[in-house]
C-alpha cells in the first residue's frame, strides 16, 4: 500500500540511525577494554560480533531508507558515506580481537591500554559529532570536536612510534614482532576510521552552514 508518510520520511530518522551506529562504534571499543584486560583468561568474541552485526543491520537500514525516502534531512551521498565510515569502526575492532585469539601466546602481558584509551576518547568525540547533526549543526562546535579528533589521531601516531621502537629493539622474538605489529596497526586503523568519519561530518556541517 502506498504510504506518503513513508515516502517523505520522518525528519529525525537518519539522525537516529546514525547516532545508533556511532553508539555501536563506541560500544565495540568499550568491549575491547574488557577484552584486553582478560587476555590471561578464556575470552570470547561474542560482544564484538554482536556489536558489528548490530551496526551492519543499522547500515543496511540506512542504505534501504536512503532509496525509499523522498525527502531526507541530509544529502543521500553524505548519509551513506558517513554510515559506511561508522560501520568500519566496529568491523576493524572485531578484526583485532580475532587476530588476538589466533596468537594469544604472543599477546599475554602486552599493554594495549594507551592506544585503547585514545580510541575510547575518539569514539566518544565522534559520537558527539554525530549528535551535533541533529542539534543544529553548530559549525564552531563541530570544528572544535574535529580538532579534538585530529589531536587524538596525532597522539595515536606518536604512540605508534613508541611501539615501533620497542618492537624493533631486538627484545622480542621475530614471530611476536610480526603479530604485535599487525595488532598495533589495526588499533591505529580504528582511530583513522574515526578521523575519516569526523571529516565526513565536518564536510556535511560546512556544506549546510
Where are the regions that the model predicts?
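Cytosolic, long alpha-helical scaffolding segments
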Residues: 1-209
